[in-house]
Amino acid sequence: MAVIGVSTTHDHHPANVIYNKNHLRYPVQTFAVNPKGGQLNRAPVYRSVGQIETAVDLAVIAVRSRFVPDVVAQCIEKGVKGAVIISGGFAETGDKDLQKEVTDLAAQADFPFVGPNCLGIYSPDAVDTFFLPGERIIHPKKGNIGFVSQSGGVLVDQMVKFAGQGIGVSAAVSIGNKACIRETHMIDWFEQDLGTRVIAFYIEGFECREGREFIKRAHTCTKPIVVLKAGKTARGIAAASSHTASVAGDYRVFSQIMAQHCVAEADTEYELTSFCEALSCYPKGSSGHIGIVSLSGGHGVVAADACGHHGLDIPEIAEQ
């Protein structure tokens, strides 16, 4: 893995954080890249990704946005298989042309990338491109939840919630502006991943017709899918646009379509956690007939009301 944009003078630079923790804690060969060259922690800093003699599977790009097209071109020329673009300053701040330049360049070369404006990928025991020091983030254990989020902050907070409930993840991916890799691609990947049983999403919005494609793909997926949809109000829609350049659309329509196509919708981050935990243990639905056993009469009443609210049947118990 090449980490492009490291600093030889500023130890807390995001690229340095990514380089250091992967170099020291994960089984990945890591290379530091900066046009000035030099050394970082007694290891050489390459002036370009092209100078690295070893084949590179992944490039983590953490340079100023205006330099990203040139760096992507260098990665393509080197034969790098894909990238995570951490850098912000693209469509989310109004520079759609710069984002399109990167996207077009990558599309012509069939070069996949995550981002821009994202944290990237966390895969337990494999790789971590989040630019947060270990003491500032709680990593859940390895498990069977695949989580995809447009927001890096929501992803980090959700990882804390998963860890608190003892829920493990197979991988967590922050896709940011999703200029290349999108939700449908992640469904494809997680569906074939043997270590994933549940696929969860935090979604702010879609481009034109993208929501329809997501629902169609989710409906055919063989694994349960849970969605936490943001941008439900006028204020939320405006916030989504400035955050990840997303078009939130009509929430009520999308919510109804999700229900029609068996996509579980969580109203809050806490519901998302509970849904993932339940589906990771019981991925296949029941007939809807529920029996309630409770030491507390009051909790039995609450459970009965919840079943009624969600259309679940509680059969009468036979006298014998």
Provide a role label for each language-model segment.
Residues M1-Q320:
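Catalytic-core regions of core metabolic enzymes
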